[in-house]
Structures are given as C-alpha cells and as structure tokens.
Regions:
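Conserved alpha-helix/loop element of class I SAM-dependent methyltransferases that forms part
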Residues: 25-44
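C-terminal alpha-helical "lid/dimerization" subdomain adjacent to the S-adenosyl-L-methionine
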Residues: 139-193
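Class I SAM-dependent methyltransferase SAM/SAH-binding core
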Residues: 49, 54-95
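Short catalytic micro-motifs in class I SAM-dependent methyltransferases
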Residues: 110-114
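C-terminal lobe and adjacent flexible extensions of AdoMet/dcAdoMet transferase-like proteins
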Residues: 199-201
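Class I SAM-dependent methyltransferase Rossmann-like catalytic core
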Residues: 2-31
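A short glycine-rich, Lys/Arg-flanked "PGG" loop and its adjoining helix->strand segment in the class I
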Residues: 121-133
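A conserved beta-strand element that flanks and buttresses the S-adenosyl-L-methionine
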Residues: 107
C-alpha cells in the first residue's frame, strides 16, 4: 500500500479528520446539500433514514424530521451520537434490523460504490422493505471522473476504498428492479463526480 493510500485509510478511520478533508475536497458538500434540499422533503416531520450515514455530515438538514442514521462503522456512529441530533445505529445496510414500512424517505450517499452488485441488490431490497409504498430514495454515488483533466478526482478513485465505482448505466440497471427513477443527473462536488438518482418505490 502506498503512502497516499495509507493516508486515505488513516483519515477514513477518524470521523473528525474524515469530515474535515471530505469537506475540503468537496467544497463543504454544497452541491450534495443542494440536491438533498431539492429532492427530499426536509423539516416536515417525515421519517427519514440516512443509510450509510458515516459521522452524520448531513444530519443538520433534517431538523424537525424523525431521522435515523445507520452505518456499519461504530466510530462514525459514536461520533454522530455525540455531535448530531437524531437516532444513530450501527447496522448492516444489507440486513437492517428495522421494521417494515418504517420510513417515508431514504438518503444513500457514497455507500453503494463500496458494494458488489449482489450486495447492492440486497441493500435496495431492504430499502424497499423499510419504505412506505411510494417512498423516496435519493441515491448519490461515485462515478468515474468525467473529465480526463480532473487529475485529483482520478487519484482519489485510485486509492479510495470503494471497489465498485460504476458507470451510470450500471447504477440504472441495478435500480430498475426496485424503484422508478423520477429524476437523475451527474453532478460535481468539489473534485468528485457523482450520479444522483431520485427513486420512487
């Protein structure tokens, strides 16, 4: 493992460092936050699941909502519990210990590119199970850097631990069995390119 890869791994293991460097590289997530504000219904008391919530970087957007954040990383969840409002649980997105039809909407940011197609299907099936009929999923996932000139974006993908960064068509194919795509787009967040899809079950 190279020096840069070790640095990325070290940063990823520490919630405060992770938030700081990701915010720096992604312009404080302004583009991501704008899409969340547009596509999810915020502050209306809705039951919302932030799946793969990490250290809770977007919890502040859901003030007034019944927010549950779930992540497999206990350090991230401990940090979120100390610093954010909401309920935060350690959990495997492929097999959620949550009741059927518990949520009105789900945010998935930067989770599925860590998972194989089989595991991604398991996550989407769980999302469909815990959502009410007609519930929304906003999935924002890493895609290969759009511009060849985005050297830092290419470098980050080469060392980042997401082993399943997919082209857009692969995400669309995976989503099609579980939900209808209401709106989708490519967006740039700092040096990172994402595919954002608003899905309706």
């Amino acid at each position: 493992m190279g020096v840069f890869s070790k640095l990325v791994e070290t940063i990823s293991d520490h919630p405060v460092l992770f938030i700081f460097f990701r915010s720096l590289l992604e312009n404080d997530f302004r583009a991501i936050r704008a899409v969340i504000r547009r596509d999810l219904r915020l502050g209306q008391g809705l039951r919302t699941l932030d799946l793969g919530c990490g250290p809770g970087a977007f919890a502040d957007l859901f003030q007034g909502d019944d927010l549950v954040g779930a992540d497999v990383n206990r350090r991230y969840i401990d940090h979120a519990r100390r610093t954010r409002k909401g309920t935060f649980v350690v959990g495997d997105a492929r097999k959620l210990e949550l009741p059927d039809r518990r949520f009105d909407q789900i945010l998935i940011f930067g989770l599925l590119h860590h998972l194989s197609d089989q595991d991604t299907r398991a996550v989407l099936a769980e999302c469909k199970r815990v959502l009410v009929p007609g519930g929304r999923i906003l999935a924002i996932e890493d895609i290969p850097a759009v511009s060849r000139l985005n050297l830092l974006g290419h470098l980050l993908h080469s060392v980042e631990n997401g082993e399943h960064i997919r082209p857009i068509e692969d995400y669309r194919r995976l989503y099609a069995d579980y939900a209808r795509i209401e709106r989708d787009e490519v967006l740039r967040s700092g040096v990172c390119d994402y595919y954002s899809a608003l899905l309706v079950t």
